[in-house]
A protein has these predicted regions:
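Solvent-exposed loop and beta-edge segments used for protein-protein assembly and interaction
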Residues: 47, 55-57, 103-105, 117, ...
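Extracellular/periplasmic metallocenter environments
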Residues: 66-73, 80-84, 91-159
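Acidic-aromatic/histidine active-site loop/patch
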Residues: 11-12, 23, 27-31, 37-38, ...
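A general structural signal for short secondary-structure junctions and capping/turn motifs
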Residues: 53, 66, 114, 130-133, ...
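Residues in well-ordered beta-strands of folded domains
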Residues: 76, 142, 178-182
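Internal, charge-rich low-complexity segments
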Residues: 5, 148-153, 189-194
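N-terminal, post-signal-peptide metal-ligating segments of extracellular/periplasmic oxidoreductases
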Residues: 1-102, 194
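Short alpha-helical segments and helix-capping/turn motifs at coil-helix boundaries
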Residues: 46-49, 60, 108, 126, ...
Length: 194
C-alpha cells in the first residue's frame, strides 16, 4: 500500500462505481499491490478471487506464505489429505488452534503436502476464518489425476479460463473454467478503507 494516500487499501473494480477493499493470496511478484503511488486500484497481477492452485495427485507440493500484510495469517488446505505436522514437528495444517502458530507480519512459513486424492478443494486463511475468508483469503485447490506426460496449469490468476487442462479433462471437455463465488459484506469491505 502507499502511505501517501488517505485510503491505503487495494481496491478492486467489481462493478461500475463499486470498488471494495479486499485481501488476496497472490503469487510473488515485483512491485506494489496498487497500480501506482497515486492510486488504490489493484495492480493487474493481483486478482480476485485468490488464484486457483492446480497440482497432480502424488506430487510433492511446497506452498510458501510470505506474510506482507499487517495481520497474522495462515493457509489451511481444506479437504486435502496431508500431514498435520512436518517430520521435524512443525505444524503443517494452517490451523493455529491445533497445528501451528500464526504467520506474523513479515514472517515466512512453508507448507508441505503430497495429495493422494483427486478433487476440487479450497485453501483459506484459518486465522479468524469468519472474517479473513470473506475478505478474500480463499482460493481453489485442484488435484488432477496423475497421468504420463500430463501438463497442468499450476496457477490460474484471472478470468477463470484454464489455458492448459489436464489429459483427463481434455478427454471429456473442450474447455475448462475455474469458478469460485464470493460473498461480500458491504460494511466489512468498506471498514478496511477507513
Amino acid at each position: 500500500f502507499s502511505p501517501d494516500l488517505k485510503d491505503p487499501i487495494t481496491t478492486f473494480n467489481i462493478a461500475p462505481g463499486i470498488q471494495p477493499g479486499f485481501w488476496a493470496f497472490a503469487p510473488k511478484s515485483r512491485g506494489m499491490s496498487n497500480e501506482s503511488f497515486a492510486s488504490t486500484k489493484a495492480n493487474p497481477l493481483l486478482r480476485l478471487p485468490s488464484p486457483s492452485i492446480r497440482v497432480e495427485q502424488g506430487d510433492k507440493i511446497i506452498v510458501t506464505l510470505e506474510n506482507s500484510h499487517y495481520f497474522p495469517h495462515s493457509i489451511h488446505f481444506h479437504g486435502v489429505d496431508h500431514p498435520f505436522q512436518k517430520e521435524n514437528g512443525e505444524g503443517n495444517d494452517g490451523v493455529p488452534q491445533t497445528s501451528n502458530k500464526l504467520t506474523m507480519p513479515g514472517k515466512v512459513v512453508s507448507y508441505e503436502l503430497t495429495p493422494r486424492q483427486t478433487g476440487t478443494m479450497v485453501y483459506h486463511c484459518h486465522v479468524q476464518a469468519h472474517t479473513h475468508i470473506l475478505m478474500g483469503l480463499i482460493g481453489m485447490f485442484i488435484v488432477e489425476e496423475n497421468r504420463p506426460n500430463n501438463w497442468v496449469q499450476t496457477f490460474n490468476i484471472g478470468a477463470g479460463f484454464v489455458r492448459h487442462s489436464s489429459k483427463a479433462v481434455k478427454e471429456a471437455y473442450s474447455q475448462e473454467y475455474d469458478l469460485q463465488y464470493q460473498d461480500l459484506d458491504k460494511e466489512l469491505h468498506s471498514l478496511i478503507q477507513t
